[in-house]
């Protein structure tokens, strides 16, 4: 929690104003932030200075794992995070590749689970990673990536957190996640949960011990219409104790995640928090 608040304060104190063409808004911006989560010790990085909806963040990551490309599918598993980008982004509404209401196009897991090969066909990056890790293999390239510049024009949004690199030392699994851009007031509390969850669940289904997760953000920013709430409300609140994430131990395979897992398979203990803050969302 401290590292999150330190980053927020750093942006407020040291950030530079940058005009964002996509949203038409100014962003207070810093370059490079590194956060670390001790997954092995169960230190769940859920924001306490406002109410955070961790199940929506986990649902979104499970949607990526399943390769979803439709906002309706994300809604069915418990998150509405793709509604606006699918249906209110004018550039996407005008895009000939859009297939209709709720279509997101080639986003995140749709790319990562079907990464195109230059000679035809595709690679299921995640299935390869899970197979290797279960068999004690780390080829120093166990990377689940969503980043394909050749497909950007075929999706409603380029991936923000675009790469998840797993590493195995002895029987302990580590994760390095890289994020090109981060809306810190709205997105980071989700992204922290997702990095933690991804390492925790992959360690569980591969039979490994979870170690540390390392989260690199390149462009960290606060939008101009979020600044007052962050500076004058959230940063004035005292952080509370760290909760614990409980994952159903019956989840034992990638197939389980793809088929029967629901948000009922996840819960938290000891989550005390301040009231919610409704930050503006920029499409």
From Swiss-Prot:
Amino-acid positions noted as binding dUMP in the UniProt annotation, renumbered to this chain: 22, 180-183, 191, 221-223
Subcellular location(s) per record: Cytoplasm
Domain of life from the UniProt record: Bacteria
GO biological process assignments: dTMP biosynthetic process; dTTP biosynthetic process; methylation
Catalysed reaction, written as an equation: dUMP + (6R)-5,10-methylene-5,6,7,8-tetrahydrofolate = 7,8-dihydrofolate + dTMP
Pfam families assigned: Thymidylat_synt
Main localization of the protein described in the UniProt heading: cytoplasm
Pathway: Pyrimidine metabolism; dTTP biosynthesis
GO cellular component: cytosol
Xref: InterPro entries: Thymidate_synth/dCMP_Mease, Thymidate_synth/dCMP_Mease_dom, Thymidate_synth/dCMP_Mease_sf, Thymidylate_synthase, Thymidylate_synthase_AS
Keywords tagged on the record: Cytoplasm, Methyltransferase, Nucleotide biosynthesis, Transferase
Entry EC no(s): 2.1.1.45
Catalytic residues identified in the record: 160
Keyword Protein transport set for record: no
Top enzyme class: transferase
Binding of (6R)-5,10-methylene-5,6,7,8-tetrahydrofolate, residues: 183, 282
A single MF term (Gene Ontology): thymidylate synthase activity
Function summary: Catalyzes the reductive methylation of 2'-deoxyuridine-5'-monophosphate (dUMP) to 2'-deoxythymidine-5'-monophosphate (dTMP) while utilizing 5,10-methylenetetrahydrofolate (mTHF) as the methyl donor and reductant in the reaction, yielding dihydrofolate (DHF) as a by-product. This enzymatic reaction provides an intracellular de novo source of dTMP, an essential precursor for DNA biosynthesis.
Record-stated family: Belongs to the thymidylate synthase family. Bacterial-type ThyA subfamily.
Subunit structure: Homodimer.
HAMAP family: Thymidy_synth_bact (MF_00008)
Protein name: Thymidylate synthase
Lineage: Bacteria, Pseudomonadati, Pseudomonadota, Gammaproteobacteria, Alteromonadales
